[in-house]
């Protein structure tokens, strides 16, 4: 018994009412009924009035399974209305006071926390863009207008519509696709170019522009789209466009479909067209005036702003890419690095394909999983010095260089580092550093790069600098936009300091900004309105046109309530460079544990060791290790990775809880899942035979990578099909036969590439082309490639980097 707590209150002897014995976490407390019940609607008033069932120990004391150390100052407050912390942190005490419902105490503690936190942010806070209005929905407007504008005939329209996204008919003329439900208010992706940024929401995109005099202004809002956006690209300087050099271009993609708009400075915008890659789009970006889309399956789509021509090219399965000037470099799963000269686009008149040239082949034949190209100051239109760093599926990091004196023999292997035991997922070669990241919880290794007259040197050569981790947990069932909207970096120009952005858990309002070279923490930012950060990016903006002014670097964060917040990283880096404080990296152990209070982690398939229902079954929300989605490690060296359990709101911060009361994502998702199941059930015929739509859905799920997860709606649909007559062994045999046939077709259609030399003399890169790369037929007026000529999917042998999406993640759903 705690002697200082039992019977020590004199009011009990003064007729203040019945004495109540409490057992809080094993420690006995004695107090009066009046002391516990003077605050209405508290935990104690409900407990003593019988509204809450009580559990008593062997002595008859009411047992409360809470922290006794934190309960002591709370009981003292109930007795005296005075607060004595008694060594308990304000944060812990506030959590306990909220549990007990002691409202006066909670208000005092929240006010104490407000002393250090402001709704206007810290000195690094730069601006706030409120959530935009959601545009009105127009039924079938996008597809119809695009077809008429591009002049697609019926065959091409069918090829595009039946590619990978089966549709279900809803009420009236509206058609929607089965897909992963996404909160329509949440900012999925933030991207920027020069003084413009674009925020991608589930069904529309919004462009903002900054001017020194007026600040940030909303310029363009796209029409409402029936499908969910997964990729976005922005070009704020289109040279030679139809409206002069003041044109801007915005593109968004979902699955295989791409839609492109032209935006003028005045805010008016017009749709350029809708294009199809024929396979899921993994990357969407601009190289000059060209819009480029790539897919891991081995397709590259290019649209030129001058010629208005869309072309799709077949290459081998792509595992990485980078850009250098007007060149697109592709790292492929056969160990080769290829490049495409965009200045020679749209096509070579001889055989109607892109100029794809093999640049280098890895000596170990490992897949090229990361690429980084550095153009030295010696490089020019007539120059021929280039440096390329790349990482492989076996964990090797290599640097190859093209010397002026080796023009005819191709790039030479310069350095090799074998410090990673997992596939390399990111690599960056800059002026002063070489940075590589592997799939082991974003393990980072860095080296200093020695240069002589701007070119990499062997004396004394690259030396190890730092080793650290950018721990970042992700949900296994996240939407396809999560990877592009939450990319850790590194961000920044290659001749300047670069940074990583660390988001430890998916549902958090805090980010850590760290130097990419050493891992040193530059700053940590916290949402000013305490809402969850759903996406982020780092861009440099030229806010002033005055002489001597320099671009400033900003961190843009998108939030689940639709707002965008901006943070001044230039000021943060200036402050940290002047500071002499001890270097701090990522979150400390205490900070990490506090962040992990929001979720459960498990190294087994069960979230809890007891027989109670796992929260993963209840909430369908799991966490996994970051960057494990690539799964490019060789089969012989595959290791069992920890599987994180589900998230749950345990000891959730009230600041987060207060903001999340306005976020209805989970209820929205559950509502969509219920309607999804009903629509699929109606679509299955009574006799159990599959109609063409069901067959498409089933085929899409059968061809998907084995590591992908199915959405709950598709799983229920499959079970109903089995119950209505389909036999399990027949399905297994059919899948096995189709997989075998696909493998045979893949071997028959495999493209043989000849190893070519490097750069030819006189040019920046040589003109040695790949002997033959099949070009998908396309029309000069924006036609799409036919699925019948698409290359066989390589995902049977190469896992898709998009595996964290559900099988139906690109398909729309019905309300």
Curated annotation (Swiss-Prot):
Protein purpose: Accessory subunit of potassium/sodium hyperpolarization-activated cyclic nucleotide-gated channel 3 (HCN3) up-regulating its cell-surface expression and current density without affecting its voltage dependence and kinetics.
All copies of domain BTB, residue ranges: 18-87
Compartments in which it is found: Cell membrane
Composition skew (Polar residues), residue ranges: 139-168
Gene Ontology biological process: protein homooligomerization
Residues recorded with modification Phosphoserine: 604, 664, 711, 793
Highest taxon of the lineage: Eukaryota
WD repeats by residue range: 174-218, 224-263, 270-305, 310-342, 354-404, 412-449, 457-504, 510-569
Quaternary state and interactors: Interacts with HCN3.
Organism, scientific name: Homo sapiens (Human)
UniProtKB keywords: Cell membrane, Membrane, Phosphoprotein, Repeat, WD repeat
The protein's name: BTB/POZ domain-containing protein KCTD3
Composition bias type Basic and acidic residues, residue spans: 736-758
Family per similarity comment: Belongs to the KCTD3 family.
Chief location: membrane
Region of interest: Interaction with HCN3: 512-815
Any single GO CC term annotated in Swiss-Prot or TrEMBL for this entry: plasma membrane
Record's keyword annotation contains Repeat: yes
Other facts: Reacts with sera from 5-25 per cent of cancer patients but not with sera from normal donors. Seventy per cent of renal cancer patients have antibodies against one or a panel of these antigens.
């Amino acid at each position: 018994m705690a002697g200082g707590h039992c019977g020590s209150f004199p009011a009990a002897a003064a007729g203040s009412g019945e004495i109540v014995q409490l057992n809080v976490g094993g420690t006995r407390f004695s107090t009066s009924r009046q002391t516990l019940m003077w605050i209405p609607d508290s935990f104690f008033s409900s407990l003593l009035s019988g509204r809450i069932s009580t559990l008593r120990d062997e002595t008859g004391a009411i047992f409360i399974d809470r922290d006794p150390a934190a309960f002591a100052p709370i009981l003292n407050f109930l007795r005296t209305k005075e607060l004595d912390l008694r060594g308990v942190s304000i944060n812990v005490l506030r959590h306990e006071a909220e549990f007990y419902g002691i409202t006066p105490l909670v208000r005092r503690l929240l006010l104490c926390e407000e002393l250090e936190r402001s709704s206007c942010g810290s000195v690094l806070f730069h601006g706030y863009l409120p959530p935009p209005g959601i545009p009105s929905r127009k039924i079938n407007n996008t597809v119809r207008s695009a077809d008429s504008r591009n002049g697609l005939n019926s065959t091409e329209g069918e090829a595009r519509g039946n590619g990978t996204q089966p549709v279900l008919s809803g009420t009236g003329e509206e058609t929607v696709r089965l897909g992963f439900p996404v909160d329509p208010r949440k900012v999925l992706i933030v991207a920027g170019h020069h003084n413009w940024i674009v925020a991608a929401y589930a069904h529309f995109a919004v462009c903002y522009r900054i001017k020194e005099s007026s600040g940030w202004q909303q310029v363009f809002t796209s029409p409402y789209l029936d499908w969910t956006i997964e990729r976005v690209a922005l070009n704020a300087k289109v040279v030679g466009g139809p409206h002069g050099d003041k044109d801007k271009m915005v593109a968004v993609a979902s699955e295989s479909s791409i839609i492109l708009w032209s935006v003028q400075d005045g805010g008016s915008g017009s749709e350029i067209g809708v294009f199809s890659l024929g396979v899921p789009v993994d990357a969407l970006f601009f190289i000059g005036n060209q819009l480029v889309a790539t897919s891991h399956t081995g397709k590259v789509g290019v649209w030129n702003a001058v010629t208005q021509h869309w072309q799709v090219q077949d290459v081998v399965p792509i595992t990485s890419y980078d850009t250098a000037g007007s060149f697109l470099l592709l790292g492929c799963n056969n160990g080769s690095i290829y490049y495409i000269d965009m200045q020679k686009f749209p096509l070579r008149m001889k055989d109607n394909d892109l100029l794809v040239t093999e640049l280098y082949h890895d000596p170990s034949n490992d897949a090229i999983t990361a690429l980084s190209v550095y153009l030295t100051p010696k490089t020019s239109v007539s120059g021929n010095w280039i440096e390329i760093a790349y990482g492989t599926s076996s964990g090797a990091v290599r640097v190859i260089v093209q010397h002026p004196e080796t023009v005819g023999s191709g790039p030479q292997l310069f350095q090799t580092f074998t410090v990673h035991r997992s596939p390399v997922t990111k690599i960056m070669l800059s002026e002063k550093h070489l940075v590589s990241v592997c799939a082991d919880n974003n393990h980072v290794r860095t080296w200093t790069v020695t240069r002589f007259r701007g070119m990499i040197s062997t004396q004394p050569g690259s030396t190890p600098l730092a080793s650290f981790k950018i721990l970042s947990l992700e949900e296994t069932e996240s939407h396809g936009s999560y990877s592009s909207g939450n990319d850790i970096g590194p961000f920044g120009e290659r001749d300047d300091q670069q940074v990583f952005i660390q988001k430890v858990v998916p549902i958090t309002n805090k980010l850590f900004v760290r130097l990419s070279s050493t891992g040193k923490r530059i700053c940590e930012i916290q949402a000013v309105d305490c809402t969850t950060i759903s996406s982020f990016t780092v861009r440099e903006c030229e806010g002033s046109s005055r002489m001597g002014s320099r671009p400033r670097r900003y961190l843009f964060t998108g939030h689940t309530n639709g707002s965008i917040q901006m943070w001044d990283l230039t000021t943060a880096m200036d402050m940290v460079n002047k500071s002499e404080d001890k270097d701090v990296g990522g979150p400390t152990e205490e900070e990490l544990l506090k962040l992990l209070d929001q979720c459960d982690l498990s190294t087994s398939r069960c979230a809890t060791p007891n027989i109670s229902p796992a929260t993963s079954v209840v909430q369908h929300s799991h966490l996994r290790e970051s960057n494990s989605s690539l799964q490019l490690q060789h089969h012989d060296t595959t290791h069992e990775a920890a599987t994180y359990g589900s998230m749950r709101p345990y000891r959730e911060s009230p600041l987060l809880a207060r903001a999340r009361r306005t976020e209805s994502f989970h209820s929205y998702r559950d509502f969509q899942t219920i309607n999804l199941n009903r629509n699929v059930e109606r679509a299955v015929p009574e006799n159990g035979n599959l109609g063409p739509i069901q067959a498409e859905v089933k085929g899409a799920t059968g061809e998907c990578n084995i590591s992908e997860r199915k959405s709950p709606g598709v799983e229920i649909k499959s079970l109903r099909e089995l119950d209505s007559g389909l036999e399990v062994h027949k399905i297994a045999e059919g899948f096995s036969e189709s997989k075998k046939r696909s493998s045979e077709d893949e071997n028959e259609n495999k493209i043989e590439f000849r190893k070519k030399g490097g750069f030819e003399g006189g040019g920046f890169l040589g003109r040695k082309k790949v002997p033959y790369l099949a070009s998908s037929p396309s029309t000069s007026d924006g036609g799409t490639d036919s699925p019948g000529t698409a290359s066989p999917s390589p995902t049977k042998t190469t896992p898709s980097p998009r595996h964290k999406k559900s099988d139906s993640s690109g398909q729309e759903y019905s309300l």
